[in-house]
Amino acid sequence: MTEMNATEATEKKSLNFIEQAVENDLKEGKNGGKVQTRFPPEPNGYLHIGHAKAICLDFGIAARYGGVCNLRFDDTNPTKEDMEYVEAIKEDIQWLGFQWGNEYYASDYFQQLWDFAVNLIKEGKAYIDEQNSEQIAAQKGTPTQPGTESPYRNRPIEESLELFNKMNSGEIEEGKMVLRAKIDMASPNMHFRDPIIYRVVKTPHHRTGETWKAYPMYDFAHGQSDYFEGVTHSLCTLEFVPHRPLYDLFVDWVKEGKDLDDNRHHQYEFNKLNLNYTLMSKRNLLILVKEHLVNGWDEIGRASCRERV
C-alpha cells in the first residue's frame, strides 16, 4: 500500500457515525447535495463546556462538508429566557472560533407553528384537554401498560378550535388547558401518548412581547423549525433518542401532501460530555447561581464557558 493510500485508509477509518451518514447522503445526492446543521441553545443560562462539544460537532460537520451551520435560539419558554443569555451565547461561540451562517429564533416561526397546530385540529389530529397536569400524567400509563384516553379526546373540532383561540387571547389561565396531539395512547413509546404540544404562558416574551399567550412545546417546535430552515442533519444528545419517532411524525404531518423523502432531514444523537466532580447542566448551574452557592457564572472551578471567556 502506498503512503497516500495508507493515509486515505486511516482517514476513512476515523469517520464517526455522523460523518458516515453525511457522506452517504452526499454520495446518494440527498438534500440537493447540501449539508446544513444548526446549534439550537435555549437562552436560559450561560453555556458550559458540554455545549462546547455540541458546538464543535455542529459547526465542524458543516465546515468539513462545505455546508453552513446556523444559530437558532430555542426561545419557546418566556419564563426562563433573557436577551442577556442570547448575547452571551453568541460571544461564547465566537470565542470558540466559530461563526454561524444565519441567526434564527424559534419565535420566528410562532405563526407558522400556530397555523400548523390549527390544521392539526381541523384534521382531527389534535384536541384541547382541560385536565390538569397531574391527571394527564396519571393517564399516560407505563412503558408496559397502555394509557387511558382523555375524556376530552373526541371533543368536537370546532370546540377545540374555539378554545385554542381563547388560549392565545388571554382568556384562559395557565394550567387550565393544553393542546394535545392525538396519536396513540397504547403506543410503547410514551412520547406518542397524546403529547402536549401547546400550553398557556402569560409571561411576556423577550422578543414578541405579549403577542402570544399560547406557546409550542419543544417537541412540537424543534423538528418543524429544522424543516422551515432547511436543516439536513439535526444533531442532538442521546436523551432525545426516544423523541426521534415523534420528531419524524411531526415532520411527516407538516410535509403532508409533499414528497416525504424530498429534502428530508434526520435527527442523529451523540453522547453528552461528562466530567467527574463537575456539574454539566445549565439548569443545575443556574440553581447554584440563583441560590448564591457560588459567586457568579465566572467563578473558577465550574464548567461554564463564562469562566473561560
Q: What kind of feature is each model-predicted range?
A:
Residues M1-Y46, G67-C69, N102, N168-S169, ...:
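Non-catalytic terminal extensions that flank enzyme cores
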Residues F110-W114, K272-L275:
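Beta-rich nucleic-acid/ligand-interaction surfaces
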Residues Y85-F110, F116-N119, G124-Y127:
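A glycine-rich helix N-cap at a beta->alpha junction
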Residues L26-K27, A63, Q94, I121, ...:
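Short polybasic/polar patches that bind polyanions
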Residues K13-K90, P204-T237:
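N-terminal catalytic cores of NTP/NDP-binding nucleotidyl/phosphoryl-transfer enzymes
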Residues L71, D75-N77, M83-E84, Y105, ...:
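Active-site cores that bind ATP or allylic diphosphates and position pyrophosphate for catalysis
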